[in-house]
Amino acid sequence: MRSDMIKKGFDKAPHRSLLKATGLKDEDFHKPFVAICNSFIEIIPGHKHLNEFGRLVKEAVRAAGMVPFEFNTIGVDDGIAMGHIGMRYSLPSREIIADSVETVVNAHWFDGMICIPNCDKITPGMMMAAMRINIPTVFVSGGPMAAGKTSKGEVVDLSSVFEGVGAYQSGKISEEELKDIEDHGCPSCGSCSGMFTANSMNCLCEVLGLALPGNGSILATDSRREQLIQRAAESLKILMERDIKPRDIVTEEAIDDAFALDMAMGGSTNTVLHTLAIAQEAGLDYDMNRIDAVSRKVPHLCKVSPASNWHMEDIDRAGGMSAILKELSRKEGVLHFDRITVTGKTLRENIADAEIQDKEVIHSLENPHSQEGGLRILKGNLAKDGAVIKSGATEVKRFEGPCVIFNSQDEALAGIMLGKVKKGDVVVIRYEGPRGGPGMPEMLAPTSAIAGMGLGADVALLTDGRFSGASRGISVGHISPEAAAGGEIALLQQGDIVCIDVEERLLEVKVSDEELAKRRKEWKRPEPKVKTGWLGRYAQMVTSANTGAVLKMQNFD
């Protein structure tokens, strides 16, 4: 066993003595040591119940004849961090989580690991760590919350609250109506109830094969979550016996299948960023061109909030991820059926008995929302290395208009609220990428303000920053190269005509190459917004969004 490094031999007497101080007995040194990587944090609704989850996981691990050791990671609630400097810490927290999990697990030579994530950066951070460490690992997430209902019976979620701010600002609803939405938008523990980033990543974790079927859609408050916990411990034991590790599971084909699901369900654009980072940690050469190839052959089968009024509970009722995959399996050349998963079985075996229970929620291949995926990769003279749009969250497929430029999210939100943006405009928010932000903050407040003011179909938004999974409308993010790296978005001038063509996958400014070259000679890189602390270090080391915004390593050759 890997853990023999800290428990076998006379020279490990000091190690055993310390371990006995934690409650271990002599017989425990003959059993596998399992890291329980939890993320219990009281300020995050998606994590406030994970203390109890951790207790249940430890019980299940002990019952399976193994020795559990629980530890916690940090986390950031993106919704609470929205609209202030806290959002700059969100994406960088992913790297801290990955580093901290790697540190604890490798310092103590665990034999296996069960990860308990749930919300935005915590799930991908743990997945990145699992790729690095590469010991048998099972993920069991905290689960989504249910949608809320206002006093009038209207179904609401967190995106409703954000959009309610814009609606109140423009006089469309009263203060009392906004308070009603606020009081009911997030009714319980769990990750926010739409197809936002947290739920998107937990669904992808399931399809990659790192989590059990049901992980992405079973509600946090559903008793079936406890059954998942029990099965997770049993599955880990099988993985350890068969020496099946994360890198055996997360192959290029597995990532293809994860993106196939992502396209079919119209997941968050952040899935692109995080999955590219996970691929890098797994040592895979996976890029945005391959994502685009998947998008072109996968139909969009289900729309979930913010693209519709359906929520994760509806997806679960309709059959969950397995039902979506089973429907996709009817189309030749989309899925890779014979790859292994944490169940110890293949994807084919995992979805064999699945079927769609409600075709209003999950459409059939014969009746898709569109023939191509709900996420698309755009390129052009404004995004030579790519950009991402959640095409399933807008009916507008082509938009052209003059750009209104803001050099920060705060500046943009103020401008939108002051009426500086009108119908037909293309809002550009730049210098908010991984390096320029720093931290590539989400633009949920501006997109929600635009939608809340009734301009969602009439105003486009471009940024080198990110979008929340709760964002909708004509929103193009992850523009690479970013402005702070000298990308073409930095060369835009007020009033330039920008064209977004979703069908042709184009993002262009109607300016000649000669004019752009002239502007580049005149461009000067702005001073970094942050020069000290963790964010200062992050800004110096982070790569662009098209490579997952991972930290670049120094070349020691």
UniProtKB/Swiss-Prot annotation:
Disulfide bonds: none annotated. Keywords: 2Fe-2S, Amino-acid biosynthesis, Branched-chain amino acid biosynthesis, Iron, Iron-sulfur, Lyase, Magnesium, Metal-binding. The modification N6-carboxylysine is found at K121. Its EC number is 4.2.1.9. [2Fe-2S] cluster binds at C119, C192. Binds 1 [2Fe-2S] cluster per subunit. This cluster acts as a Lewis acid cofactor. The active site is at S468 (proton acceptor). Pfam families: ILV_EDD_C, ILVD_EDD_N. Belongs to the IlvD/Edd family. This is Dihydroxy-acid dehydratase.
